[in-house]
């Protein structure tokens, strides 16, 4: 931490309280008024005024339990007297434990529930010839922003670095200054009156300067946004009015009907020398002190603040910054500065109850909850500024922030500061420049461990959360009843059915729909084309479009997880090829046998649903998921590049080009020298002969259809050279990939407003496709385009839309079909459930639950329907589903400056999937539009989807570690807990399995691919012998244990909890010399009192107090 100007800073801001003045207030409430109250008048009051401690009648004071306070704090409350320097006596009760106790208590009212805080630091500014005013110099939502020296702009948000000395001085201010908790006030004037009355009563402020300090506090506040908004149309007045109206029910209206105590009004003016009873609590109302001499009335203050044109009477609001403040946030105002007429420091910490909108005090129109006032003599402005930064930074600390809301007295606040000091990290002064602004981190560590007490074994009392989510939950528990899991899925998803449609009203859903429609169209049509080639047109592109649309619509409407996108898979295509070849060799009807197999497969899948077989998904861990997902992503990338290279066969390049012979290059269509029998038969059917055809006048497509030959220097192998088309296709391909990735990252760009960046990022891929289509159309190069069937009818005329399972095949084929159906069932089950597991991971923070059984049922039913109609089978597509989820990610719209938006979850709805497949079915009628989309653009989209889906896969992060020195490796959580050699061993095993899957996938044995995916589960089980359970918990998900093992673990946990409870009930008595068994456990409050810095503060304070007692001020109270 920063330590500077120590000579000036060693002088304390406040003298320490001694026995003659006041003992450090260990009570919950102190009245600043010298008025006698009866006990029954004081009980049950919430307002706390922590100030002077004056014993009554020589009676030894004791702490009393408040009716709404803590119930178990006797050991702290019964310490009535402290040391002269304000320190508590040594104790093993550490600040961390006290803070955990404070945060663990629950108040009966909602008034002390913590809210988000906006903190503003204002400093009083004096200029010659001008009236003084409060100027905003810094603000905090999460990180610090300063007004730059020029005063024209805000700095970038940065992590606040504080000097240790300023934190010590802040602690001294809270210990010895005025602390007013739960003050009832409606205006800044009332707050100033109460604070100054407290200061005068306690002898911290002279009566003759009270009026001048009050005037200083009433000075107008000038905020940084006022200058740049001064000339704008005051439309923002309505926004301020909204904030005012939201706050008035909690401020003016609530207090309007309060009855002022008959003793409270004259208390300040007349009874200043009376002795107040300890624990006195006074409910100050808005009329308190309003008639005192020298005070400015609220009306007078309003007249002074409302100078200027009418449109400036309501302060301008920075709407852009206002959007970053969370709903329900409150303000804490820090007021520091130098006053020439002060000879000692005025310090006050105020908590309002309820929070009140103080017009003109904060930059934004939100209710103020806390005020910290620090005014002192000239010459210590920088010191005051650093203390103001310290309290503002503390207010942004998650733990102290909660302590400030729940504190019952001064000691609670001091404990919060001590706990903060116990957690801070100190930077050596010789190795760090404090003027360097630290950039906000991308991820801020959780502070929950600071709030939860620890048990003897070092873990949190409430248990340590798993490092990452597995697949446990009610969705995967066996019910023991037929269709029990399916019934629970329906009950779980039914309440969200209508919200699945309402939640889709967002531009993000429109962007996702347009992007994925283009992404899904091409593979469906391509798959149909390949299937048509393999089955001689029995199932082709039109059947593929119709089947995908029908299956997708049904699944999107009634599926358990509508975020899953259905598509075609490679193993299905391999199975279709093998089946067609088998039927052709044995003279069987392919479509009929396929229908029988499909119906058996659907029946077996329904049996799996009835027996809750989806509960076996819990054995699919991250190890299997990542291997499967990585393979599919790599296949997408590989096939995209393969399709691009295949264009070189259709549009070849002359690799032996000679620029000097360009005038001699030509390519002509000639009669084939030796036409094949098929060619001659085709000519005869068309009533043509070789002599009837004028070969030299034929176009390229006509020459190809008549099986002519290309002759000439500009001809390749069966095609003319077309270099511009291939090169242009390559340009389109890589431009699509680059532009998609760039626009997707545009959300984090520094250009344009946030809303524009967000829209561009959501529509990134669609905008890319649109731009590439326009550019391709403008250039005019005939690149290959998307071909969509233009007529809705079966590809072959000899088949209809329905197929009988038996057909012309023998009867026994229906029974024999169960054998290949078993293999198909494994294929469908593994593809569907692994994809569902990836989509339903806890990292996605899905709130509407999942439905593994319902998903499998819908896939099984539609598989049976597609089999009867002779349509392709569709199952969950991994990459398309991951892309769908990534396109619907939700992030916090209201994030503090410098804070990374928080991932909130996924926009769960059914509309995007539904619209994708509805439009896909309508594509037959949109061929006039779709024919403009170049195929290289869609190949580029495939590559982008495959590459973007690899992000977040831990396997590739671990692969990078092989080439990184240890000192340059990222701070992955598993590297902290698992030896690097074990991490590498885990990665090698996973890469070996991935390589084996790849070999099987691209070979003729691709039909057994699902069996190999299933084998990964057993490989993972064998890894229990190579790695410990703890190592696997960090590198992978833990697999379910046997019932006996679970019972043993439960017994061990119960024993540990019993030991923890016994330990909590044990009373530890310190030995002589305060010996501690564990040297790592210290009390920061006790250790701080032993430091020379704190001691110097106390010694100087005592000297200052002694000097003041020798030469008392005339106006100081007796």
Curated annotation (Swiss-Prot):
Residues 59-76 have a biased composition (Basic residues). It comes from the Eukaryota. Induction: Repressed in the brain by chronic continuous hypoxia (at protein level). Keywords: Antiport, Cell membrane, Cell projection, Glycoprotein, Ion transport, Membrane, Phosphoprotein, Sodium, Sodium transport, Symport, Synapse, Transmembrane, Transmembrane helix, Transport, Zinc. N-glycosylated. GO terms for biological process: brain morphogenesis; locomotory exploration behavior; multicellular organism growth; post-embryonic development; protein glycosylation; proton transmembrane transport; pyramidal neuron development; regulation of cellular pH. It is found in: Basolateral cell membrane; Apical cell membrane; Cell projection, Dendrite; Cell projection, Axon. Disruption phenotype: Homozygotes are born at the expected Mendelian ratio but most pups die around weaning. When fed soft food from the second week of life onward, most pups catch up with the weight of their wild-type littermates and survive. Adults display normal weight and lifespan, are fertile and do not display major behavioral abnormalities. However, brain ventricle size is drastically reduced and mutants show diminished Na(+)-dependent recovery of pH following acid loading of choroid plexus epithelial cells. Belongs to the anion exchanger (TC 2.A.31) family. The N-terminal cytoplasmic domain is likely to have a high level of intrinsic disorder. Sodium/bicarbonate cotransporter which plays an important role in regulating intracellular pH. Has been shown to act as a sodium/bicarbonate cotransporter in exchange for intracellular chloride. Has also been shown to act as a sodium/biocarbonate cotransporter which is not responsible for net efflux of chloride, with the observed chloride efflux being due to chloride self-exchange. Controls neuronal pH and may contribute to the secretion of cerebrospinal fluid. This is Sodium-driven chloride bicarbonate exchanger.
């Amino acid at each position: 931490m920063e330590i500077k100007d120590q000579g000036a800073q060693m002088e304390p801001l406040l003298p320490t309280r001694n026995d003659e003045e006041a003992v450090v207030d260990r009570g919950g409430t102190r009245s600043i008024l010298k008025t006698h109250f009866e006990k029954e008048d004081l009980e049950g009051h919430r307002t706390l005024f922590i100030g002077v401690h004056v014993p009554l009648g020589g009676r030894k004071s004791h702490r009393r339990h408040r009716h709404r306070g803590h119930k178990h704090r006797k050991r702290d409350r019964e310490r009535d007297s402290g040391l002269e320097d304000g320190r508590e006596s040594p104790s093993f009760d550490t600040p961390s434990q006290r803070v955990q106790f404070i945060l663990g208590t629950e108040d009966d009212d909602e008034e002390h529930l913590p809210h988000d805080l906006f903190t503003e630091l204002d400093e009083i500014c004096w200029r010659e010839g001008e009236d003084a005013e409060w100027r905003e110099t810094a603000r905090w939502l999460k990180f610090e922003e300063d007004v730059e020296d020029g005063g024209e702009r805000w700095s970038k948000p940065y992590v606040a670095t504080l000097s240790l000395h300023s934190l010590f001085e802040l602690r001294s201010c809270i210990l010895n200054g005025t602390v007013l908790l739960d003050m009832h006030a409606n205006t800044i004037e009332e707050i100033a009156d109460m604070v100054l009355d407290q200061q005068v009563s306690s002898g911290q402020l002279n009566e003759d300067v009270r009026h001048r300090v009050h005037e200083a506090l009433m000075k107008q506040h000038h905020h940084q946004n006022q200058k740049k908004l001064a000339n704008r149309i005051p439309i923002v007045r309505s926004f301020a009015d909204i904030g005012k109206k939201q706050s008035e029910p909690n401020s003016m209206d609530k207090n309007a009907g309060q009855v002022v105590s008959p003793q409270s009004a004259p208390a300040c003016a007349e009874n200043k020398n009376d002795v107040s009873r300890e624990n006195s609590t006074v409910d100050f109302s808005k009329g308190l002190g309003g008639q005192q001499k020298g005070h400015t009335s609220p009306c007078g203050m309003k007249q002074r603040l409302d100078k200027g044109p009418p449109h400036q009477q309501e302060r301008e609001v920075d709407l852009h910054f206002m959007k970053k403040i969370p709903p329900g946030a409150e303000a804490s105002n820090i007021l520091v500065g130098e006053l020439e007429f002060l000879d000692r420091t005025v310090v006050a910490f105020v908590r309002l109850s309820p929070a009140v909108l103080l017009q003109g005090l904060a930059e934004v129109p939100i209710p103020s909850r806390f005020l910290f006032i620090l005014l002192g003599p000239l010459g210590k402005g920088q010191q005051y500024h650093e203390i103001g930064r310290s309290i503002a930074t503390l207010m942004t600390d998650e733990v102290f922030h909660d302590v400030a809301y729940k504190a019952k007295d001064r000691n609670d606040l001091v404990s919060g500061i001590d706990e903060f000091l116990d957690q801070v990290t100190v930077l050596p002064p010789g190795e760090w420049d404090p003027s360097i602004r630290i950039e906000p981190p991308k991820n801020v560590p959780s502070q929950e461990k600071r709030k939860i007490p620890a048990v003897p074994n070092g873990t949190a009392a409430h248990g340590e959360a798993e490092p990452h989510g597995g697949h446990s939950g009610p969705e995967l528990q066996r019910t023991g009843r037929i269709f029990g899991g399916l019934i629970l899925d329906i009950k779980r998803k039914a309440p969200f059915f209508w919200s699945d449609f309402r939640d889709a009203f967002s531009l993000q859903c429109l962007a996702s729909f347009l992007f994925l429609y283009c992404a899904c169209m091409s593979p469906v049509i391509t798959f149909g084309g390949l299937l048509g080639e393999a089955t001689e047109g029995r199932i082709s592109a039109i059947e593929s479009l119709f089947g995908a649309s029908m299956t997708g619509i049904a699944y999107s409407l009634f599926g358990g997880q509508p975020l899953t996108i259905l598509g075609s898979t490679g193993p299905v295509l391999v199975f279709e090829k093998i089946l067609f070849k088998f039927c052709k060799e044995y003279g069987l009807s392919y479509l009929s046998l396929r229908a029988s197999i499909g119906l058996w497969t659907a029946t077996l899948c329904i049996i799996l649903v009835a027996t809750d077989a989806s509960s076996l998904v819990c054995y699919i861990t991250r190890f299997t998921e990542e291997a499967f997902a990585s393979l599919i992503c790599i296949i997408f990338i590989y096939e995209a590049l393969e399709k691009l290279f295949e264009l070189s066969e259709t549009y070849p390049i002359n690799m032996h080009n000679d620029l000097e012979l360009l005038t001699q290059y030509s390519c002509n269509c000639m009669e084939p020298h030796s036409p094949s029998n098929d060619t001659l038969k085709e000519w005869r059917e068309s009533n043509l002969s070789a002599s009837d055809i004028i070969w030299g006048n034929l176009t390229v497509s006509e020459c190809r259809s008549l099986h002519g030959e290309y002759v000439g220097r500009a001809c390749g192998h069966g095609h003319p050279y077309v270099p511009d088309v291939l090169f242009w296709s390559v340009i389109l391909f890589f431009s699509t990939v680059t532009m998609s990735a760039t626009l997707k990252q545009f959300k984090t760009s520094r250009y344009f407003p946030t809303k524009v960046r967000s829209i561009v990022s959501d529509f990134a891929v669609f905008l890319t496709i649109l731009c590439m289509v326009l550019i391709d159309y403008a250039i005019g190069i005939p690149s290959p385009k998307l071909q969509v069937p233009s007529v809705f009818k079966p590809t072959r005329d000899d088949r209809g839309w329905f197929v009988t399972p038996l057909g012309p095949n023998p009867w026994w084929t229906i029974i024999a079909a169960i054998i290949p159906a078993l293999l198909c069932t494994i294929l469908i089950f593994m593809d569907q459930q692994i994809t569902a597991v990836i989509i339903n991971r806890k990292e996605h923070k899905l709130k509407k639950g999942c439905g593994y059984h319902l998903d499998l049922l819908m896939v099984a039913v539609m598989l049976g329907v597609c089999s009867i109609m002779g349509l392709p089978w569709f199952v969950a597509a991994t990459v398309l589903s991951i892309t769908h989820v990534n396109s619907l990610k939700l992030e916090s719209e209201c994030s503090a400056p410098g804070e990374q938006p928080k991932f909130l979850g996924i926009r769960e709805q059914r509309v995007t999937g539904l619209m994708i497949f509805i439009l896909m079915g309508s594509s037959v009628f949109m061929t006039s539009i779709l024919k403009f989309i170049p195929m290289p653009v869609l190949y580029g989209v495939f590559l982008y989807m495959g590459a973007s889906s690899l992000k977040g896969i831990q396997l590739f992060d671990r692969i990078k570690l092989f080439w990184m020195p240890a000192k340059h490796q990222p701070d992955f959580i598993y590297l902290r807990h698992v030896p690097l050699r074990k991490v590498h061993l885990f990665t090698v095993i996973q890469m070996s399995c991935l390589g084996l899957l790849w070999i099987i996938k691209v070979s003729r044995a691709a039909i057994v691919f699902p069996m190999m995916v299933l084998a990964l589960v057993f490989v993972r089980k064998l890894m229990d012998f190579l790695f410990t359970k703890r190592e696997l918990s960090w590198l992978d998900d833990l697999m379910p244990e046997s019932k006996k093992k679970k019972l043993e673990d439960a017994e061990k946990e119960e024993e540990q909890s019993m030991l923890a409870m016994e330990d909590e009930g044990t009373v530890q008595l310190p030995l002589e010399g305060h010996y501690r068994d564990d040297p790592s456990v210290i009390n920061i409050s006790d250790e701080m009192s032993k430091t020379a810095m704190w001691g110097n503060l106390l010694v100087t304070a005592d000297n200052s107090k002694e000097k003041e007692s020798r030469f008392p001020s005339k106006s100081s109270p007796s």
